[in-house]
Amino acid sequence: MSFRNLTIAAIAGAIVSTTALVAPASAQEEGIYVPLLTYRTGAFAGSGIPIADGMHDYLTMLNERDGGIGGVKLIIEECETGYDTKRGVECYESVRAKNPVVVNPYSTGITLQLIPRAAVDKIPVLSMAYGLSASADGETFPWVFNPPVTYWDGASVFVKHIAEREGGFENLAGKTVGLLHLDAPYGREPIPVLEALAEEHGFELKLYPVAAQDMQNQGSVWLNIRRDRPDYIYLQGWGAMNPTAVREAIRTGFPIENMIGVWWAGGDEDARAGGADAAGYKALSFNGAGTDFPFIQDVITHVHDKGLSQFPRERVGDMLYNRGLYNSMLIAEAIRTAQEITGKSVVTGEDVRRGLENLNVTEERLAEMGMTGFAAPLNVTCENHSGNHDVFVAEWDGEKWTVGQDWTEPMTDRVRPLILAAAQEYASANAGWPERTEPCDN
């Protein structure tokens, strides 16, 4: 395990140390402790690094520009998981005693291990657009949050997108849709929704799992894809799997415009791997790319210009870096909301759980934060812990991400009943799963 105390100004460009740097007890007492479970090493580092830096840099910007949140500094500390579930749980055990106000596992596998712990330890789990889709049911999972959107919502937007391209849902009958996915809990998440929509609309669903050890060697999988000739591919990949899939699609002649990635398959390095031939590749997204937003200019001024970031200045605005910024905005808004609800300056995990459950990021609030056009409004409630945020389809133009299809609402009428049923199934399968006793503030 490796830790970084990020309340101390980081040396620009420094290599992340494997030595634990723990905030002094006095700082722990005076600040709000926000641990970040990250991965800067291993096969998933290409995706993990920009997100880790984005999360760190937004929180650091709040410390530098505003003195923290509500006058209280944020104590930011990283723990390296390597995207490994066992190491992730070890990280959680290491930070748990320091009274974190929220935990971001940044791995579906780690999230699944922490879900049963959250209510016991009184530490909310924020699995931003990842984790267990069923945890969007706040009645069953009062301590787990997955805003702004679930994997099941994303799969429904993908189907909605291809239906629009085909001229209507009725024209999906007889089509073949492939799910190219990491053979892990994360990669398998969209299968139930895709199966349900395939049955409803008459398309055939083909599954193409990729083992973690084969992420950079997908030749056999793409032989199967060439044999089956699916009309569309939904890419639920991560780390080194994504750029490899883009290159393989181009190499085998699969129409790149017909491969659409989930939001975690929409990194700049993912698309850039295909060179000019990757133009037309698409991925779902819920945050903007680029630097043309006032809050990102604040990150540049208060973090990068002061040498407090490890992320290359020229890559600020990359899609996944911006997603890390967005993730930390949710953390910060939950803390701010918790302060408003409780009247406290230094809040606890129990307080921030209430803050997450009352997140209401309006257009006006987005404008106040300098995020107009960067994200859609978000409203989390006691019943709905994801918010069913709109999603847009981003398209790679050969150099950068553009908006290929405007903000699209998930098929909530189809997805929500499946989420509620899956939540009840989870509770039934876990003997003694507690009934919700937490009061509702909305």
Label every model-predicted segment.
Residues 308-321, 332-406, 410:
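Segments of small-molecule ligand-sensing domains
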Residues 29-33, 46-53, 65-138, 147, ...:
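Beta-alpha junction/loop-to-helix N-cap segments that form part of ligand/metal-binding clefts
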Residues 87, 133-134, 142-253, 290-297:
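Extracellular/periplasmic Venus flytrap/periplasmic-binding protein
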Residues 249-327, 408, 422:
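Extracellular/periplasmic periplasmic-binding protein-like sensory domains
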